[in-house]
């Protein structure tokens, strides 16, 4: 879905009109979040966000898996498989599955790390354990009560924060903010903005860990596009941030097209983009997630689509590493309720 503009402005008459619906939605979500989950038999680290839409969870999940491997863990990512038709539980195989099967994000991640897709997270956790997982990294699911979470790590964009602070549909929040903050163990703020500062202060006051990070362009991607003019397109939660990252990397973005998150590109849309690129002498560039979703259709265009990859760089990685180690050891010695 494409987020309404009023979600990211001070509360307006429209958001106030929708507040009663937001109150009902918030009550339902709060009730679900308070339910007791099932122990997975291994530590569960949840990478989530407070609001609908993108915040940088996928690059955070991949960065977290890398750190956990450095700690001699065998993490497996557990995903709901949004946008995919398979209910699972299933271990994603990029050679057999496509985005229509398992969703774009799980497919993209599975090219680097083991990923289990399951609508039922308890069943997914069981499969991951049978595949040798020493711990589970949940990509999203902060508001889902199915599994006991031993560490909840929230990702937030420094420019967007929590928007107008209202619960859906009056705003972008998935649940009332105080309850979500109460259940947050660590916060990763992506970027240099100040929109998340109040949330960070609230979490720090409760003893939570607050870290800064930034999205860093992949060096090979930058080198591949050096000296080229590009037409960039993206169907992700925050296309503007992606385009800004391209420009900050020195890429000459001559044209850009933003689509809704998880947008199902049609052949006609792709052909139109390719025709514009050919006419203007531009190189087509998109995200790894979008390219995973486009799949084999890209081969029919007659124009190459270049993926521009980004990774998450945490400013104080040693502190995050130590925090993870402490929380994992605690989870193994003292199970967490709820």
UniProtKB/Swiss-Prot annotation:
State which pathway it belongs to: Glycolipid biosynthesis; lipid IV(A) biosynthesis; lipid IV(A) from (3R)-3-hydroxytetradecanoyl-[acyl-carrier-protein] and UDP-N-acetyl-alpha-D-glucosamine: step 6/6
Q: Which GO terms describe its biological process?
A: lipid A biosynthetic process; lipopolysaccharide core region biosynthetic process
Task: List the protein's name.
Answer: Tetraacyldisaccharide 4'-kinase
Keyword Transferase: yes or no?
A: yes
Question: Which residues bind ATP per the record?
Answer: 51-58
What task does this protein carry out?
Answer: Transfers the gamma-phosphate of ATP to the 4'-position of a tetraacyldisaccharide 1-phosphate intermediate (termed DS-1-P) to form tetraacyldisaccharide 1,4'-bis-phosphate (lipid IVA).
> Keywords, A to Z?
ATP-binding, Kinase, Lipid A biosynthesis, Lipid biosynthesis, Lipid metabolism, Nucleotide-binding, Transferase
Question: Matching SUPFAM superfamilies, A to Z?
Answer: P-loop containing nucleoside triphosphate hydrolases
Q: Which GO terms describe its molecular function?
A: ATP binding; tetraacyldisaccharide 4'-kinase activity
Species of the source: Rhodopseudomonas palustris (strain HaA2)
**EC number in record:** 2.7.1.130
Among InterPro entries, the record links this protein to:
LpxK (IPR003758), P-loop_NTPase (IPR027417)
GO CC field:
plasma membrane
List all membrane-crossing ranges: none
What catalytic activity is recorded? a lipid A disaccharide + ATP = a lipid IVA + ADP + H(+)
């Amino acid at each position: 879905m494409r987020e309404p503009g009023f979600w990211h402005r001070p509360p307006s008459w429209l958001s106030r009109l929708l507040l009663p619906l937001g109150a009902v939605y918030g009550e339902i979500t709060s009730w679900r979040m308070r339910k007791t989950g099932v122990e997975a038999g291994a530590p569960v680290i949840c990478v989530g966000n407070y609001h609908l839409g993108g915040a940088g969870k996928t690059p955070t999940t991949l960065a977290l898996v890398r750190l956990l491997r450095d700690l001699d863990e065998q993490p497996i990512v557990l995903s709901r498989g949004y946008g995919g038709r398979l209910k699972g539980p299933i271990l994603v195989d990029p050679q057999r599955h496509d985005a229509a099967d398992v969703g774009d994000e799980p497919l993209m991640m599975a090219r680097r790390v083991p990923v289990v897709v399951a609508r039922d997270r308890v069943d997914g956790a069981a499969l991951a354990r049978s595949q040798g997982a020493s711990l589970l990294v949940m990509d999203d699911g902060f508001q889902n009560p199915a599994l006991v979470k031993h560490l909840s790590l929230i990702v937030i964009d420094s420019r967007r924060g929590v928007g107008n602070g209202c619960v859906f549909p009056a705003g972008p929040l998935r649940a009332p903010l105080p309850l979500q903050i109460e259940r947050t163990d660590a916060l990763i703020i992506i970027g240099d903005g100040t929109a998340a500062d109040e949330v960070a202060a609230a979490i720090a006051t409760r003893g939570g860990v607050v870290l800064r990070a930034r999205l860093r362009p992949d060096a090979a991607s930058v080198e591949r596009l050096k000296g080229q003019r590009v037409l960039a397109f993206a169907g992700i939660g925050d296309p503007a941030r992606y385009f800004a990252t391209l420009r900050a990397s020195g890429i000459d973005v001559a044209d850009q097209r933003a689509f809704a998150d998880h947008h199902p590109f049609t052949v006609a849309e792709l052909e139109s983009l390719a025709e514009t690129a050919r006419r203007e002498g531009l190189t087509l560039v998109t995200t790894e997630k979008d390219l995973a979703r486009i799949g084999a259709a890209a081969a029919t265009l007659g124009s190459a689509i270049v993926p521009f990859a980004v990774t998450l760089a945490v400013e104080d990685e040693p502190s995050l590493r130590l925090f993870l180690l402490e929380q994992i050891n605690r989870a193994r010695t003292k199970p967490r309720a709820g």
